[in-house]
């Protein structure tokens, strides 16, 4: 017990030295989180041995010590990866590498140079909310785990950044409009400038992906006064592009269902399409198979509004968990939700496991496959599932 107390005192003394030094070197911040790991491990071991106090310090429970240790390990590993990037030589303070900063939106990435953005709902100062716009956001690529720096931006819709040609919103102003406002209109005040509702243009050359949830199909939009009136052909073309972006409407779905029923009455199955309707194929760098796009199986209707496009990832359980974790941190806007790891009950535990990923539309699923690299040794089986 005395040896454990001495080690804990030495560890905490080094932590206090780092606090007093207030260094801006990344090496010192890595050392800080390493010492936090050691401290939590010592607490865990002491509690495991039945100790409730070490000197005058209360030993936390096993669950608390374990949670703090896991948090410190995550921060320590993330900082080690950051040190190997091109931004390892930049100034990094304890505040920049704190857990609170890591968990602040956008979560699980490094942020610097924050600017306050005030959103006034209904144009009333008493109905204002403040958010932080990070000018520098360092996010991790999903394909090669490299850290890259992107610029934080603001629009009438919210706060976002563009990573790998995908616009990722981490704050959406319309959510607070339902709580604080009545008209659904707001003003964005940032850096002495004001962004009004009539300055919002829903048509953009950059592809937009919401931070979470399905694609937002309805927005109260107004054409900017600076835009010239569209002719009939241009207006129809822009309307068609918007409809394609949000997926088929109810009338289109009914037409697709009617066509599907007609095709079922006159089936023309070939051996290859029948086999494809029963099984899914792996998705790799050389080929992509979507069985539902060619199958006439009456139990699968891609146009059925009660069915959602999915991808069943099959592989090693640990690899699936790691891949799902990376998706949640870096590509959450490219899918709707992901399941936990599961298996068929008739298979032994040493067999491959599955993770099912849901999408709001086939377009979103295709965008996911175009932007996300499936790890080697992992199969992606495309299909549809009933919505529940």
Curated annotation (Swiss-Prot):
Its main location: host cell. Phosphorylated. Residues 218-227, 266-276 have a biased composition (Polar residues). It holds the Pfam family PPV_E2_C. Residues 251-265 have a biased composition (Low complexity). Residues 1-206 are annotated as: Transactivation domain. InterPro entries: E2/EBNA1_C_sf, Nucleotide-bd_a/b_plait_sf, Papillomavirus_E2_C, PPV_E2_N, Reg_prot_E2, Regulatory_protein_E2_N, Regulatory_protein_E2_N_1, Regulatory_protein_E2_N_2. Binds DNA as homodimer. Interacts with protein E1; this interaction greatly increases E1 DNA-binding activity. Interacts with protein L1; this interaction enhances E2-dependent replication and transcription activation. Interacts with protein L2; this interaction inhibits E2 transcriptional activity but not DNA replication function E2. Interacts with protein E7; this interaction inhibits E7 oncogenic activity. Interacts with host TAF1; this interaction modulates E2-dependent transcriptional regulation. Interacts with host BRD4; this interaction mediates E2 transcriptional activation function. HAMAP family: PPV_E2. This is Regulatory protein E2. The lineage of its organism: Viruses, Monodnaviria, Shotokuvirae, Cossaviricota, Papovaviricetes. The gene is E2.
């Amino acid at each position: 017990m005395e040896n454990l107390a001495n080690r804990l005192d030495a560890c905490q003394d080094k932590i206090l030295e780092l606090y007093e030094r207030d260094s801006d070197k990344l090496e010192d911040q890595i050392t800080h989180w390493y010492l936090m790991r050691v401290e939590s491990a010592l607490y865990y071991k002491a509690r495991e041995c039945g100790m409730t106090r070490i000197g005058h310090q209360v030993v936390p429970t096993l669950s608390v010590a374990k949670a703090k240790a896991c948090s410190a390990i995550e921060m320590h590993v993330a900082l080690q990866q950051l040190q190997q990037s091109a931004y390892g030589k930049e100034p990094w303070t304890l505040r920049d590498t704190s857990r609170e900063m890591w968990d602040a939106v956008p979560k699980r990435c490094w942020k610097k140079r924050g600017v306050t953005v005030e959103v006034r709902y209904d144009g009333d100062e008493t109905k204002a909310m403040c958010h932080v716009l990070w000018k520098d956001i360092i996010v991790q690529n999903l394909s090669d785990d490299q850290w890259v720096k992107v610029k934080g931006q603001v629009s009438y819709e919210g706060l976002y950044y563009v990573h790998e040609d995908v616009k990722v919103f981490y704050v959406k102003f319309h959510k607070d409009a339902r709580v604080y406002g009545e008209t659904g209109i707001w003003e964005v005040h940032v850096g002495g400038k004001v962004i009004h509702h009539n300055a919002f243009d829903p048509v953009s050359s950059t592809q937009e992906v919401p931070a979470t949830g399905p694609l937002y199909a309805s927005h109260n939009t107004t054409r900017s006064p600076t835009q010239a009136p569209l002719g009939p052909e241009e207006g129809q073309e822009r309307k068609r592009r918007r409809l394609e972006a949000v997926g088929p409407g109810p009338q289109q779905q009914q037409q697709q269902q009617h066509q599907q029923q007609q095709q079922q009455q006159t089936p023309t199955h070939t051996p290859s399409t029948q086999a494809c309707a029963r099984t899914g194929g792996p998705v790799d760098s050389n080929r992509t198979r979507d069985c539902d796009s060619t199958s006439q199986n009456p139990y699968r209707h891609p146009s059925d509004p009660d069915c959602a496009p999915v991808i069943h990832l099959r592989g090693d359980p640990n690899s699936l968990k790691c891949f799902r974790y990376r998706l949640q941190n870096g590509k959450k806007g490219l899918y709707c939700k992901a399941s936990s790891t599961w298996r068929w009950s008739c298979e032994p535990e040493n067999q491959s496991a599955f993770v099912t990923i849901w999408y709001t539309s086939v377009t979103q699923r295709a965008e996911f496959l175009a932007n996300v690299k499936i790890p080697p040794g992992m199969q992606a089986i495309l299909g549809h599932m009933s919505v529940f």
